[in-house]
Amino acid sequence: MSEDSDMEKAIKETSILEEYSINWTQKLGAGISGPVRVCVKKSTQERFALKILLDRPKARNEVRLHMMCATHPNIVQIIEVFANSVQFPHESSPRARLLIVMEMMEGGELFHRISQHRHFTEKQASQVTKQIALALQHCHLLNIAHRDLKPENLLFKDNSLDAPVKLCDFGFAKVDQGDLMTPQFTPYYVAPQVLEAQRRHQKEKSGIIPTSPTPYTYNKSCDLWSLGVIIYVMLCGYPPFYSKHHSRTIPKDMRKKIMTGSFEFPEEEWSQISEMAKDVVRKLLKVKPEERLTIEGVLDHPWLNSTEALDNVLPSAQLMMDKAVVAGIQQAHAEQLANMRIQDLKVSLKPLHSVNNPILRKRKLLGTKPKDGIYIHDHENGTEDSNVALEKLRDVIAQCILPQAGKGENEDEKLNEVMQEAWKYNRECKLLRDALQSFSWNGRGFTDKVDRLKLAEVVKQVIEEQTLPHEPQ
């Protein structure tokens, strides 16, 4: 029996509400396809995480690949999957969706955990790395590339000191057949061959170079590049590649650093970190995929198997906590991912009278709502204007927290520009209006010096308020 048919049999078509209570207002985090919520098993009162996807082939593929990988102790487990109709606000009728019940991860995201751990040691970083590598090895043995390895997708099971870390979110995962051509990435964690694939695609579309008979591809080695970046940040608190310029796309200076593998180990943070740790980073951040460590090479590396104490306290926790920008950087990454995902998610919806789905035709004729329909209030599928409004707010956060090219009027002008755009789309938001008054905003610019980190935090609160659902009907 095929894996596809096994998965189809595993998906329940009964209403999830028969077995679970769903808290529509409590969000655990935002995956690439929308917020993850809390649900409670009625028979046991056990809490689980609930992810909701539009029921499309891409979503079923995500579920299939995640199910294939989820038997590993360092990968978030799928408990069960429901296929139900769910109606969100601004939708005229229910839409078929997959409701994925997953194990609850109470310990939070990787970098949040580190920022709360004042004595995070190199040994602990090594142990976390080993768990991530074991999860990747399991995926790669199944010939699956995750393609979105980043700190937000690495969660701790609970708050105990020895809690396992687990990989989640298989929204970009693909079976690696040497044809992983769709550029999917988060800027700080993107491998050089992904950028090369993107560059060739753009040139071919523009007719600058002839379409090559054999497309430039990238594969599982990209996950290993991302692992190298994550290790680097875990050890020192900042990424090896960054740009001095805020941009909605990867700027030239950052692109050049990635393509040439240009990074350093600044003495201030790296002087107490072992040569073994630096060695594994160097070998993972090789520009040429064939020179990069394999996942087996990572697991065999002395740093992951050392008997040395490695009890030196890392600077990463203090840096992340003091700069208070981890959440803002993650939001900027999410925005970048959304922009790169636009082409993948464009959908043409047929009017109901012309749809060829026999179930929908039957429902139309009956003139009734589906028996298994779930009707809620939520902003995640809001109007185009509301999406643009959130996008403009995230631009403000990015401008506030990304490294600045310089000081003075130029940077102030850039902040004023992005704030004007955000203000244009969010004038009715009382929280933003009140906050901007305290920052001396006159509608066109800030008249006083702005504490950018405080502004980023306020705008983050505005976004959270804008995306909070109403009570369910």
Swiss-Prot record:
Modification Phosphoserine, positions: 115, 212, 354
Chain positions recorded as ATP binding sites: 28-36, 51
GO MF annotations, alphabetized: ATP binding; mitogen-activated protein kinase binding; p53 binding; protein kinase activity; protein serine kinase activity; protein serine/threonine kinase activity
Reactions performed catalytically: L-seryl-[protein] + ATP = O-phospho-L-seryl-[protein] + ADP + H(+); L-threonyl-[protein] + ATP = O-phospho-L-threonyl-[protein] + ADP + H(+)
Coiled coil: 409-440
Main location: cytoplasm
Consequence of gene loss (knockout): Phenotypes are different depending on reports. According to a first report, mice are viable and fertile and do not show changes in tissue morphology and behavior: they exhibit the same susceptibility to LPS-induced endotoxic shock as wild-type animals and do not show the defects in LPS-induced biosynthesis of inflammatory cytokines known to occur with Mapkapk2-deficient animals. According to another report, both homozygous and heterozygous mutant mice are highly susceptible to skin carcinogenesis induced by DMBA.
PTM annotation: Phosphorylated on Thr-182 ERK3/MAPK6 or ERK4/MAPK4; which is the regulatory phosphorylation site and is located on the T-loop/loop 12, leading to activation. Phosphorylation at Thr-182 by p38-alpha/MAPK14, p38-beta/MAPK11 is subject to debate. Phosphorylated at Ser-115 by PKA/PRKACA, leading to localization to the cytoplasm. Autophosphorylated.
Tree of life domain: Eukaryota
Disulfide pairings: none
Modified residues (Phosphothreonine): 182
CDD domains in the cross-refs: STKc_MAPKAPK5
Cellular compartments annotated: Cytoplasm; Nucleus
Top-level class of the enzyme under EC nomenclature: transferase
All residue ranges annotated as the Protein kinase domain in the record: 22-304
One GO CC term, this protein: cytosol
Tissue expression pattern: Expressed ubiquitously.
Consequence recorded when altering residue 337 to A: Constitutive active mutant. In a knockin model, mouse display increased amounts of head dips and open arm time on the maze, compared to littermate controls
Description of activity control: Activated following phosphorylation at Thr-182 by p38-alpha/MAPK14, p38-beta/MAPK11, ERK2/MAPK1, ERK3/MAPK6, and ERK4/MAPK4. Activated by stress-related extracellular stimuli; such as H(2)O(2), arsenite, anisomycin TNF alpha and also PMA and the calcium ionophore A23187; but to a lesser extent. In vitro, activated by SQSTM1. Inhibited by diterpenoid alkaloid noroxoaconitine.
Similarity section: Belongs to the protein kinase superfamily. CAMK Ser/Thr protein kinase family.
Oligomer status and interactors: Interacts with SQSTM1. Interacts with ERK3/MAPK6 and ERK4/MAPK4 (via FRIEDE motif); the interaction is direct. Interacts with YWHAE; the interaction prevents phosphorylation of HSP27/HSPB1 leading to disrupt F-actin polymerization.
UniProt xrefs under PANTHER family: SERINE/THREONINE-PROTEIN KINASE
Protein name in the entry: MAP kinase-activated protein kinase 5
Organism the protein comes from: Mus musculus
